[in-house]
Amino acid sequence: MFERAPKLEKTFRRYPQAPLFARLADHYLRKGRLMRAQALCEEGCERFPSYPTGFFVLSRCYERQRMWEEARTALDHGLRLDPDNPAGYRRLAHVYREMGNETLALKCLERAAALDPLSETLGFELEQMLTAVRNCARRGAVTPVAE
């Protein structure tokens, strides 16, 4: 099987002024090299603070480690830079669910669905989340959601 890492690493070193770190970090993440991916993203996000993809990949590094607050912060930063990214809002919804905040998770899924209205998967997830939040509200666990 062809290994992409050497080619990506070479390109990354050859063009240090380009934000190629996110692509290389994503590759490392897929290959299980979590700490290398995280270090690369942290450095890259510092060098390229207006590159949203770097923050989205960094959030995945944190999610893998169940570092939910750090993942939320990285996603928030990425979404401030790219506010029309439905995948970012979908992932932020997942992070909020993991943090136990169903209401904010629902708001993020609603935003993702508004940005990608043709996604059947998002529509299904949104309906499931809405049902879960309503059930929690009936038990007094969260603030009710207005319909």
Language-model segments: residues:
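Canonical positions in the second alpha-helix
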Residues: 10-11, 43-44, 77-78, 111-112
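Short coil turns that delineate tetratricopeptide repeat
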Residues: 15-16, 49, 83, 117
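Structural marker of alpha-solenoid helical repeat scaffolds
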Residues: 47, 64, 81-82, 98, ...
